[in-house]
Amino acid sequence: MTVRLHPTDAQTYWMSAKIPNDQFLLYCFDTDSPAESVREELLRRAEQISDLGMRIVDFPLSLRYPSLRRAPDTTDLVHIRETGRTWRDCLDTVAEAFTDQLDPHRSVWRLHLVGGVTGAPRCDGPALVAILQISHAFGDGRVASSLARRLFGDDRSAPAPIADRTRIGPREFFRRATRAYDLERQLAADTAAGTVPASAPGRPRIRVNVAPAGRTSVRCLVRDRSDFTAPGISVTVGAATAISLALERYLAHHGDPVPPELGAEATLGKHGERRARNHFGNAGVDLRPDITDLAARAHAISESLQARRRRAAHPAAEAQSLASEAVPAVLLHWGVRQFDATAVPDTVTGNTVLSSVARGAADLEVGGGPVRFTAGFPALSPIMGLTHGVHGIGDAVTVSVTSAASAMPDPDVYCSFLDRAIDEVSTALRRSCAR
């Protein structure tokens, strides 16, 4: 089977040469089953999932977009890491894995197994931790989560439907380009009229907006879903509110001013038909450190997030995506090669990254043990030394923190602020409901 990559996915693939972007999906299972026995179980499951038998093949000189083809062998893609480790050791293993990015020409995935993990949250005894590493070109967080569910025992999880690509001739290219231009003008008019929110402004850089260097640290806070929610407040917004408070206190701890424009670069699912494996965009969301009442802050953050979604839902966005599909592969690849990953902008879309994905019901099982929680770790980038993942399964929500020593030399200090902030936000939301 040969499937040509969508231009969006090809761009993600080519960009990985400049900014590593593999995804790492962690699932913790409450079982003392040996990793060796679980490995065979998972290999059998992987063989039944066609998407896990793929690799990326380049076309000479990028005259066409790369394609997905069958990989010759996947039997050595499940790696057993050292067993009998603590939960902190396991997180260090995750951070170490960031440095060993996939070769997608061989396979688009790899699985790391760590058995006998002691002290894992919500586990009664030793735990088995599985970390699915997957090429971002192969799918966004929702695609990757669907694959993980199938690998870990959910036979009902269906792959995300992706529309077939059609050949685009000169006439169709002209039609799409013209429509994109017309709708871009309409977006400008709608923005001026106030019917569509304006673009989010850039934000001043803070101490974490530096190139990642030194040790990479990973931390996870596993909490109940109810700690983040209230009427009108989603898990994403509740977590963003806690992050805003923790960042505010961390900056003050180091004697830095807290900019009123403090914000997060959030991932938002695109509207319309999924035409690519990566069907999302990024937008800057206000974190509103100027509002001291945490319930009111949460509602203000929710309004900012909804404003970004309303703008992204304008027909101009989808028209632009359709027009970009007609860009020749050689031209898009040339443009990616011109990208300067070392350039430092005056402002940033967000001061940290916030990626939030719901990974379904807690009905997965490996080695006879149920899943207790899941986590994810958005990649660091040249001006982003701190990222946050918010991932839920069942009633458990994990807020993960990935940081570089150059941006945050004291991650445990920050995580203590974040842990307390979640408690305070939860209390504030409950009190607001009782009024």
Regions found by a protein language model. Name each.
Residues I19-Q23:
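TRNA-binding/sensing appendages of the translation machinery
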Residues H388:
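Hydrophobic/aromatic beta-strand elements that line small-molecule binding cavities or substrate pockets
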